[in-house]
Amino acid sequence: MLSVSRVASRMTGVVARFSTGGHGDGAGRGGGSGGSIRDAGGAFGKMEAAREDEYFYKKQKAQLEELRKHIQQEVDHHKSQLENHQKVLDRHQKRISEIEAEERALGKE
């Protein structure tokens, strides 16, 4: 059975080993295998890593835009519901006022 300190020391070595190098520097440096072009390293590996980063940047940007649109639709929907509820509330308050006026008129007779 491994102790916590042994596991931690082993994990530290793994993190230190993989954190050397940058994206596209080749296999084993910067996160391991990413395909044959990235395994080779050099300019092509770095270019492929840059394209990959750009792809995920654009994908995240599109997802955030979709989320923003969806939330805006919800805001618009709730504003519409709020307006409808306000109209119903006003109508009910008017009806209550009319009933109270009728009660007062009946009380005077």
From Swiss-Prot:
Which residue windows does the record flag with biased composition (Gly residues)?
21-35
Q: Which Pfam families match?
A: IATP (PF04568)
Provide this UniProt record's keywords sorted from A to Z. Coiled coil, Mitochondrion, Transit peptide
Q: Which stretches does the entry tag as region Disordered?
A: 17-39, 73-95
Q: Does the keyword Transit peptide apply?
A: yes
Question: Which Gene Ontology cellular-component terms appear in the entry?
Answer: mitochondrion
SS bonds (residue pairs): none
The protein's GO terms of the molecular function aspect are: ATPase inhibitor activity
Instruction: Please give the SUPFAM superfamilies that the UniProt record associates with this protein.
Output: F1 ATPase inhibitor, IF1, C-terminal domain (SSF64602)
Where in the cell does this protein reside?
A: Mitochondrion
Q: Is Mitochondrion there in the keyword field? A: yes
- Coiled-coil region: 45-109
Q: Which family does it belong to?
A: Belongs to the ATPase inhibitor family.
Instruction: State its role.
Output: Thought to be a regulatory component of the ATP-synthesizing complex in the mitochondria.
Instruction: List the protein's name.
Output: ATPase inhibitor mai-2, mitochondrial
